[in-house]
Curated annotation (Swiss-Prot):
Positions bound to GTP: 201-208, 315-319, 380-383
Segments of this protein annotated with the region G2 motif: 227-240
Stored InterPro entries: Dynamin, Dynamin_GTPase, Dynamin_N, G_DYNAMIN_dom, P-loop_NTPase
Family in the record: Belongs to the TRAFAC class dynamin-like GTPase superfamily. Dynamin/Fzo/YdjA family.
Residue ranges, compositional bias (Polar residues): 22-31, 532-543
Lineage per the UniProt record: Eukaryota, Amoebozoa, Evosea, Eumycetozoa, Dictyostelia
EC number(s) recorded for this UniProt protein: 3.6.5.5
Protein name: Dynamin-like protein A
Amino acid sequence: MSVFKKKDKSDDKKKKHDEETPQGTFQPASQSTSNTNLNSLASSVNNGASVGSTNGSTPNNSNGSTPTYNHNNSAEELEKQKKEEDEKRKKSELEAAAAVVAKKKEDEEKQRKEQVELERKRRDEEIRRTNAAAANAANKELNEQVEISSLEQMGKLDPSSTIHDMFSFFPNEVYNSYEKLQYFSRDLNTAVSHPEIVFVGPRSSGKSSLIEAFIGRALNIVGGGNIVGVGGSNANGCSKRVLYLQFTNNIDFEVPKVTIKKDNTIKEFDHDIIVSIEQLNENLAKRNQLTNDYIEEPIYVSIESRTTLNLTLIDSPGLLFDQSQAESNKIESIVSSLLRPSHRLIIAVESCSQDWKSMSMGQYLKKIDPELSRSTFVFTKFHHTVRGFSSTRDINKYLSGTVPDIKGFFVTLPNHQVRASYSEANRFQEKIYQAHKRDMHALEQLQYDKRYERTIGVAPLRRYILNIVWKSYQDTIPRILKHLRSKRQTAEATLNELQKQSSSLDSTKLRSIASNYTVTFLQITEKLLSGTSEGNPSANGQTLDEEKSQQGDCGEWVDAYKEAIYIDPEEWNIPYWSSKLYGGQQLERLMAEFKAVCDNSKISEVKMDDIATASGINKLNNIPNYAWAASDLTSLISRDTFVPLIEQLCERAMYIMKRLTDIADKVIDSRRKSRCIGSSPFGGNGLNNINSGGNNGININDRLSNTDMDSLDQYPFFTHHVKNLYYDFVHRAAKGCKEKCMDEFYSSRTIYWELTEHPDSSLPSIRNDHHETKTAVCQLATKLFDSIRQRITKNVLLKLYNFFLVPMQTDLWNEIQAQITCLSNEQLEQLFEVQATREQLKQEEKKQQQILEKYSQIDEQFLKAASLFCRPLSNPTPSA
């Protein structure tokens, strides 16, 4: 009994221990079981020991055999429990593994069933789509047959009918005359703008279908379903890009030549491609398959034909008024950029609706064309709307419900299946005619108001637009003719002028031209020296820095050692140093600059060697003459200092005078231009001033012949001869002035004589004290240098004025005029190159005569072509 009791106590302790162990503590299953068994065993042993000690008073238990037996029994039980728990653990692991395998098989089976179900649904969907496509094709075929049958009931197009497509709208004579007008405008370099027409409207409103109907050819740019097109229902069609159809008149192509221009956005199409009309749709589809979004880069298609006027039709992307805001805004931005140029005609295309309030294009266009002055409205799918009316009152009310004062047309176009089936030009035109006739038949049944007949159908719309195009070119004819006549008059005037020049090449006339030019040249030169703004100082004048930079090495002042002399014009008070001057004022500034340089010149250092050598021995008392030394040194230093400055002064003075020839030429050219525009530089009418002589105070230049002065460009040798005479005189005047200036440098003896008139007792008489000697001589030399500098500066400026500037204003006239007057007839002919000039004038006359004859022929041909082109055409204006 004690053994079982101990076991029960051990179990109680084990249970208590398990309850006290935290649940969050992680222990492996085997370890936990072993610990539990060991605890149970220890508990049993302790309990046994406790019982033994308690019953120790009993004699039967005093030998201690019972505790040994209980210990062995507990070990066996512990081992047994361990085995049982190991078996349970293995069994649970096997069960878990089996459960995982079963779960995996179950998932695989479920996935297989789902795949089977998806495959079945896919097959069902394919079958459904195939059936739907077949049904749709059958419905389309049925609708096409119904549409064709409905159109065929309207009868065939009469070959003699006046219904023409765009390529046969005008007679051949009109296209031929138009080609000639274009040729004349190019030959005359007169730009003629080509009309541009933009088709705009909501998506699926029929813009591109209307373009095809307007042209009268199935260009296959429209499609739906499996046919990719511009304006069809296919969202991947050309409607994502703007399409320019550029029609060009070219007499070389009887059959229209279609060229798709290079596409910079797609590398595959970076070159022009020539295609047939049948291949146009395929090529456009390829381009748009590579376009993922709406882009502003357009597609350009050139269509050249002998029977077309130059115009451009622009097909825009369809507007989306009820779609996402981002996409709609992008399309509106592209379309608005197309409509914004004010020279473009706008064709607003919109599907008909019995409720005018639901029409959206009117409000949209008013944002761009507020007065709707260049907008025309075309309402498509008119047949479906007409079938909804049952009374005359309702149909007339509908037709009169358009916005007042707008140009509107109602059209019905064959659907794309019919257009694809009848793409041949005549058959396509016939279907358009039948659709129009069907509309008119329905309107006749309703007894509509005949006033609206001119607004119904493609033919009135085509006539209306082409007449606008024709009238735009007709309006350019007077401008081209005016330009032609202006060129003809210019050619006649040039020819007359050449004939006058040729007849004037005699000695008397040449002498008159020579005298007139010489007088004009000398007079302008004198005015530029005296002071005048006629030479345009802002353009022809020079600042002090510009004057020096233009002269190069001679521009900067240098001393005797070729070192540049720094000048601060502002500090040295040089007048007008930053102003643009020429002539006399520029020479005055040069003289002021020369004076400033001289005034700031200092005597160079005097060395003792020079003093000792220059002093010498006085012949009277053998005492050194330091006054003589100072005079000699001052004479040498002043010559070395001022001679380079005088030479530079003369060089720059010659440069200023030589500049006057170019300025005089510009003044003469300015006066000639003033006469050409009917004015004179002296005021009033040029001819009146010239013929008025001196009675009104006009100087001699006013008596010059306009013809003589205007023809001076023909005689460059003579004008150069006059300028060379002027340059020679300037050189001689500058040379004489320089020689006069050199007289200012006195000899040492002259300076000494002047100095000894006022002897200075401060000069030392003993040569032993070198420092005192040098100081005294330097002071005297400096005093002498300052006196000489003042005298030279003053006298040089006076001589420059008297011997250089004054002769330019007096002797220049007499000398040059005398040399020109004394020229013999042979010399004049040589200077004027009479023989070469006559040959040149003959060639120019011949050339100008050919030009005049050409313009006369063009004038005659142009008038004939304009007469053929300006045939009377009806220009219907649709009623409101």
